[in-house]
Swiss-Prot record:
It comes from Streptococcus pyogenes serotype M6 (strain ATCC BAA-946 / MGAS10394). The keyword Mitochondrion does not apply. One of its GO terms (cellular component) is cytosol. It holds the Pfam family HHH_5. Gene3D superfamilies: 5' to 3' exonuclease, C-terminal subdomain, 6.20.10.30, BRCT domain, DNA ligase/mRNA capping enzyme, Helix hairpin bin, Nucleic acid-binding proteins. It catalyses: NAD(+) + (deoxyribonucleotide)n-3'-hydroxyl + 5'-phospho-(deoxyribonucleotide)m = (deoxyribonucleotide)n+m + AMP + beta-nicotinamide D-nucleotide. The gene is ligA. This is DNA ligase.
Amino acid sequence: MKKRIKELTDLLNRYRYDYYTKDAPSVSDSDYDKLYRELVTLEQSYPEYVLQDSPTQQVGGTILKGFEKYRHQYPLFSLQDAFSREELDAFDKRVKAEFPNATYLAELKIDGLSISLSYENGFLQVGATRGDGNIGENITENIKKIKDIPHQLSEPLTITVRGEAYMSRQSFKAINEARQENGETEFANPRNAAAGTLRQLDTSVVAKRQLATFLYQEASPTARNQQNEVLAELADLGFSVNPYYQLTSSMDEIWDFIKTIEAKRDQLAYDIDGVVIKVNSLAMQEELGFTVKAPRWAIAYKFPAEEKEAEILSVDWTVGRTGVVTPTANLTPVQLAGTTVSRATLHNVDYIAEKDIRIGDTVIVYKAGDIIPAVLNVVMSKRNQQEVMLIPKLCPSCGSELVHFEDEVALRCINPLCPSLIQRSLEHFASRDAMNITGLGPAIVEKLFLAGFVHDVADIYQLTKEDFMQLDGIKEKSADKLLAAIEASKSNSAEKLLFGLGIRHIGSKVSRLILEVYGDISALLTAKEEEIARIDGLGSTIAQSLTQYFEQKTAAILVDELKTAGVNMHYSGQKVNSDAALFGLTVVLTGKLNQLNRNEAKDKLEALGAKVTGSVSKKTDLVIAGSDAGSKLEKAKSLGIRIEDEDWLRKF
């Protein structure tokens, strides 16, 4: 189970990066949700194996360069997803167990890009993207080009509000027609178009593309008592507020609202992908609190994926950086969610066998919103002695024999000299989350590799201007930019380098956790497996993978070559202080604090080494209780958990 949890964590984190950071989803919503729910189930059954970088413990995406980073004063959370009436009823039961008289506000889930707007004395100061929930991108100048966002409010308030920026279907169609005429790549969907627009460095482009917004939340403290009052105030202040919502205490009425909206979603001028249900009382919201990732007082019902039939014409097999061989089906073109689809993932050999997918089959292809399609199943009634799919025995890149480990669902090439494996590893090293070498994408990497200029990541730092100039299509100016990007990458903090090495099970967050303890890449050459396994959030699988990598002679040589080239080996963040007063304690805040707001208290606790969570359990070490503390305080007392007040916290 531990191994499966790790596999799911790594896979889902890769999909999250593609979705949130690159705005280029690589898996369907349905497939992602299926894997995510499997991970949630396993983590609930085996909580001791939950990893620090699990997507169940995270929000949103990572940060692209090009805009200044912006730390949100009030974090942005994701929402818990629901896909059935039963899950909504379970949510209702949990809420009503604490607040029998709770009412809900159901709002449309706009398929756009989350934004945060901060005003001082009524004037817009900062517009930012969500990013990872704590740090986003400052896109203020682009935000000012969206016509329905007021630069000055109708009242001189200091306030932070949240909402969604989107592109209407009409604007999306016009933009894609213009891009087609100009020979440019068309946007896949309105969400991608909106995301790409907000990241434009040329603000005039933003103005031309006619984005719009719907605001739905006051993140800063508000005098309003109910969510529907918040929407009314936002409208009074001059913001656009979506007119479709329903206030009720009945889940039957909410379900009727969902079905009504689902039936008319194609008639709307913009894309939606579900309905969000929130506890209407803000006081109840505060008492219900948050999990690590999501509020306990809200849930997002997501509409089912759209499905179409297509015929499988052939299958391509490609090798990834870890050697995993992935099948992709070539299809008869079909229109799906507003785009023409001619390729779909088949996931892995076990999936093909389970579904009995064959060449020539008519299959169901599905795609939710802006997600790359996948094959759901075969239409058996249309099968007519189709060709059984031949599973490759040899690597399509190097010809080596493929292996299928018992505990894995994928075929894998284990030849370290496989050209595709090397190229994918180089691409990963240069990617944004790793060393962020701008311009060094797949096409350039392939040319460098085929020319014999690079065979491992250390070779990147030996490249010269003359090397680049020998490649087709590379001019002097491009060569200079590439060399500058390579040089700039040398000063990255070491966790980006560790992640860039592509060690199995070592993601970006795990890299940071490791280096918070060890401080330097060189120290990992002699790190002991049992020491690494003791780091909170890691465990034996990660520890074994890391030590196996650094025990190789080639790893020591590579580290030495990178160090000689001037690549930074040192972690620039704050190392873990095991002497902090509350180091290692799990703490819960409950009730109303008089001197500190919630975020200030949370920051103080984390600075003291504590981990702050939203619910009381047997794992909780300490509860900080303010006035009017409710069920969390009672539960803490029943479990015999240590309880302190705000004055105790302020003494530190």
